[in-house]
A protein has these predicted regions:
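Sec-dependent signal peptide recognition
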Residues: 2-8
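C-terminal motif of bacterial Sec signal peptides marking the signal peptidase cleavage site
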Residues: 13-16
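Bacterial signal peptide processing site
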Residues: 18-20
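Low-complexity, Ser/Thr/Pro/Gly-rich disordered linker/stalk regions
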Residues: 25-129, 133-137, 143-152, 212, ...
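Extracellular/lumenal carbohydrate-interaction signature centered on repeated Trp-anchored short motifs
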Residues: 101-111, 177-185, 192, 225
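Short tryptophan-centered beta-strand motifs in secreted/extracellular beta-sheet-rich domains
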Residues: 112-114, 185-193, 198-202
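Glycine-aromatic-enriched beta-strand/loop faces of beta-sandwich-type recognition domains
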Residues: 136-185, 237
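Aromatic sugar-binding interfaces of carbohydrate-active proteins
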Residues: 181, 197-262
């Protein structure tokens, strides 16, 4: 009888220990999963101008545009809330890491305004700095661009407005170029989307004062502009993946992005 009593006690203790161990393991695993999620989120998203953005980070893979390497370390928001996009050379690998973010939210008709700090008019001919709408998976359609780029040729204009059609041949895109010469490190860029047109206007300084405006343009009547809500992208990258001709790293600072619906 005593033997049976002791066996029962031992069995109960064993079950209790297993429950404690299971509970402990579950807590640790849960904590690790939560930590993992937070770590992933910390490097894959960023909060800027009241919007959550995804960060393009492909590790050792090269993808377009370019193709290029893309790294989360090339993107950050400072204590003032300003967004930094930096083209950086990795000293360990010799790779140039590019920067891109895109909004989780989609935006439709209305005005899109970016306040920039830096000299995008003085970028190396192999660099591209873009502010744009883009529909992933439908390259050549549903895209509205402001791009600072000479496309690898130092003799070409450095400022580009481009609107891709909602349908049809991408080669029918509407595009205008301009030789940009800023008068300082602050500038503002805007496009407005409606169901019929896309209109552009840019400004010296962080203002939309008409006296500071330059290079206004509008798509022609009948051009098939996108009518879809689209994410907003900002990127800094190398044309065809070619290193800067001057070998210099570059940083662009975006003070704000604002969308005003219409």
């Amino acid at each position: 009888m005593k033997n049976m009593y002791f066996i029962a006690i031992i069995a109960m203790l064993a079950i209790s220990c297993k429950k404690d161990q299971a509970s402990g393991n579950t807590a640790v695993n849960s904590g690790e999963q939560e930590l993992g999620k937070k770590s992933v989120n910390a490097v894959s998203t960023i909060f800027f101008s009241g919007i959550t953005w995804n960060i393009k980070d492909l590790g050792n893979k090269t993808v377009g545009p370019g193709p290029n390497y893309w790294a989360a370390s090339s993107v950050w928001v400072d204590t003032q809330g300003f967004l930094h996009l930096r083209l950086k050379k990795d000293p360990a690998t010799g790779r140039w890491n590019c920067a891109e973010i895109y909004s989780q939210q989609k935006f439709g008709y209305g005005s899109y305004v970016w306040e920039i700090e830096g000299r995008p008019d003085q970028l190396d001919p192999n660099l591209v700095f873009g502010l744009f709408n883009y529909k992933d998976g439908d390259d050549g359609h549903h895209e509205v661009d402001i791009e600072f780029a000479r496309w690898g040729n130092s003799q070409w204009p450095n400022f580009n407005y481009t609107v891709y059609p909602a349908y049809g041949d991408p080669e029918t895109r509407y595009s205008k170029t301009y030789e940009l010469a800023l008068n300082g490190t602050y500038s503002t860029y805007k496009f407005t989307r409606t169901s019929q047109i896309v209109s552009y206007k840019s400004y010296h300084g962080h203002t939309q004062n008409e006296a500071n405006s330059f290079y206004a343009d509008t798509t022609p009547t009948g051009f098939p502009v996108s009518t879809e809500a689209l994410p907003v992208h900002l990127n800094l990258w190398l044309f065809r993946g070619n290193a800067p001709t001057n070998g210099q790293e570059v940083e662009m600072i975006v003070h704000s992005f604002k969308f005003t619906p219409q």
